[in-house]
Amino acid sequence: MTDPNKMIINLALFGMTQSGKSSAGNILLGSTDFHSSFAPCSVTTCCSLGRSCHLHSFMRRGGLEVALQVQVLDTPGYPHSRLSKKYVKQEVKEALAHHFGQGGLHLALLVQRADVPFCGQEVTDPVQMIQELLGHAWMNYTAILFTHAEKIEEAGLTEDKYLHEASDTLKTLLNSIQHKYVFQYKKGKSLNEQRMKILERIMEFIKENCYQVLTFK
């Protein structure tokens, strides 16, 4: 029986090598579950699931205070420096079915560095994988998480100005996913403050989608 005082949200991270997926996953979990480091090659080679502690009184739903638990699936970079596209895609497909086959996926987060232009085949490869794995309704279950957003401030840009000057490819994608995006900053904010801000934004997306989930076989 579902506990009305608790809610679990299931998230999956997608993105290119060195986009900051594992680091973003650790912020979402409030832990260091995922190995994250700078390297000239892909670091993550297999999917892994992390679970956060309960965030008590995170939100109110139906007049009740609800504790939130976050489950995050970290995936290998795509394209990968050592693994074939076919292998990575199959690995992620099996992980989605294993971890979210019954509970379902609330949101796929496309992790994209804010200081890397969104253009060319490499940046669209992860989007294509999301489309193939999530199916025709992928737009309703996908958001963009921009990492290294402090680079935007360093360049003297606001978030709105940054998006206004973005590539047509990024603008088209944002239109497709109903402008679901969130920025992650490394400087000037505590990890907990970042985490809460990002989770609040993610919960807005999930609520707008009526708490629906995608299930996998």
Swiss-Prot record:
It holds the Pfam family AIG1. Residues 6-217 form the AIG1-type G domain. It comes from the Eukaryota. PROSITE patterns: G_AIG1. One of its GO terms (molecular function) is GTP binding. GTP binds at residues 15-23, 36, 148-150. Belongs to the TRAFAC class TrmE-Era-EngA-EngB-Septin-like GTPase superfamily. AIG1/Toc34/Toc159-like paraseptin GTPase family. IAN subfamily. This is GTPase IMAP family member GIMD1. It comes from Homo sapiens (Human). The gene is GIMD1.
